[in-house]
Amino acid sequence: SNTKILFLCSPNNPTGNSFDINILSDLIKDFKGIVVIDEAYIDFSSQKSLINLIGKYENLIITQTMSKAYGMAGIRLGMGFSNEKIISYINKIKPPYNINILTENKALEELKKVSEIKSNVNSILNQKEKLISFLEKLDFVEKIYESDANFILVKVDNADLRYNQLLKKGIVVRNRTNQYLCQNCLRITVGTKDENKILIKTLNEL
């Protein structure tokens, strides 16, 4: 009852699943504090962004990034969206300097490439489905979690073993076995067609 702010990640990391929009709407409506929804992976999701709900709920903040679908993690650019009242409070406490001009120009340049970004996202989603189909056939894969992101969370027989086997082959995945409810889970980022071919070939050899 004393909670002032609630952070949610949808699509979630590391599971990749999205929260149901109706459930989120009810939560935002009933929660007395601020609700921040991190939509870093929203471009890969079949579910729409909740940005349109900002005008409906006074306690909603949406955050997004150019690190994922836009492939620009190096410029470290994130965005926050909310109503005028909340933004005015944030402006009072944030550092005095905004993003540098090089970052700003690069971001504006990339935002014009709508069709190219959509094409890249569709390619990743297509490769994700192919990768899932392959993973389902592996004996050491016990479960594949539904994903709305550009990665797949996979439960295997022994996450530490499989992680190290892949690492020795020059392939880095995320070992999430020490995270709560993720025992023996690996998070695999979906690569390009050629990268996935290498991954599939390597997994076949384990």
Briefly describe each language-model feature range:
Residues 82, 154-157, 190-192:
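Short beta-strand-to-loop capping motifs
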Residues 22-30, 52-56, 89:
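Catalytic-core regions built around general acid/base machinery
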Residues 3, 33, 59-60, 141, ...:
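Short, conserved active-site loop motifs that form the nucleotide-linked donor/cofactor pocket
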Residues 22, 168-169, 179-206:
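PLP-dependent enzyme catalytic core of the Aspartate aminotransferase-like
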